[in-house]
């Protein structure tokens, strides 16, 4: 993903986590907050408890690629943080991962033309 489409600073992540809404899909969680910009930005969190550096980087790369492929469908004006919650994300088939990400984006209502569901957590 291009640098302009990524969250970079801890303050940006904290704002999304604090002000945004949360949707949970078991292995992956999404926090999303409006950003008043013409673009949507994404960030990715993979905790150390999910495995060593190789596993964490593999999860981060795979989730980032799934989001990159779906990015044209995402409406502008959102900041999103994807939080990996399972080491299985490193091993599941990529089409399954892509479907999981797409389902989260649709539930959050950030896909162009989608309507948001009630979040799992506030």
Curated annotation (Swiss-Prot):
InterPro entries recorded: Ribosomal_Su5_D2-typ_SF, Ribsml_uS5_D2-typ_fold_subgr, RNase_P, RNase_P_CS
Among the entry's GO cellular component annotations, what is one? ribonuclease P complex
Example GO BP = tRNA 5'-leader removal
State the EC number(s): 3.1.26.5
Q: Which GO terms describe its molecular function?
A: 3'-tRNA processing endoribonuclease activity; ribonuclease P activity; tRNA binding
Q: Which reaction does it catalyse?
A: Endonucleolytic cleavage of RNA, removing 5'-extranucleotides from tRNA precursor
Q: Which domain of life is it from?
A: Bacteria
Q: List the disulfide bonds.
A: none
Pfam families documented for this protein? Ribonuclease_P
Which UniProt key words apply to this protein?
A: Endonuclease, Hydrolase, Nuclease, RNA-binding, tRNA processing
Q: What class of enzyme is it?
A: hydrolase
PANTHER family in the cross-refs = RIBONUCLEASE P PROTEIN COMPONENT
Q: Which family does it belong to?
A: Belongs to the RnpA family.
- Quaternary state and interactors: Consists of a catalytic RNA component (M1 or rnpB) and a protein subunit.
Its function?
RNaseP catalyzes the removal of the 5'-leader sequence from pre-tRNA to produce the mature 5'-terminus. It can also cleave other RNA substrates such as 4.5S RNA. The protein component plays an auxiliary but essential role in vivo by binding to the 5'-leader sequence and broadening the substrate specificity of the ribozyme.
Q: What is this protein called?
A: Ribonuclease P protein component
What species was this sequence derived from? Roseiflexus castenholzii (strain DSM 13941 / HLO8)
State the taxonomy lineage.
Bacteria, Bacillati, Chloroflexota, Chloroflexia, Chloroflexales
Q: Which gene encodes it?
A: rnpA
């Amino acid at each position: 993903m291009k640098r302009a489409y990524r969250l970079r600073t801890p303050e940006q992540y904290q704002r999304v986590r604090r002000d945004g809404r949360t949707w949970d899909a078991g292995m992956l969680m999404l926090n999303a907050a409006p950003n008043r910009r013409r673009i949507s930005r994404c960030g990715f969190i993979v905790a150390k408890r999910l495995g060593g550096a190789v596993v964490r980087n593999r999860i981060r790369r795979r989730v980032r690629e799934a989001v990159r492929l779906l990015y044209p469908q995402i409406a502008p004006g959102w900041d999103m943080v994807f939080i990996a919650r399972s080491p299985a994300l490193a091993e599941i088939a990529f089409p399954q991962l892509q479907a999981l990400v797409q389902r989260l984006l649709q539930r959050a209502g950030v896909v162009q033309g989608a309507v948001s569901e009630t979040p799992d957590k506030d």
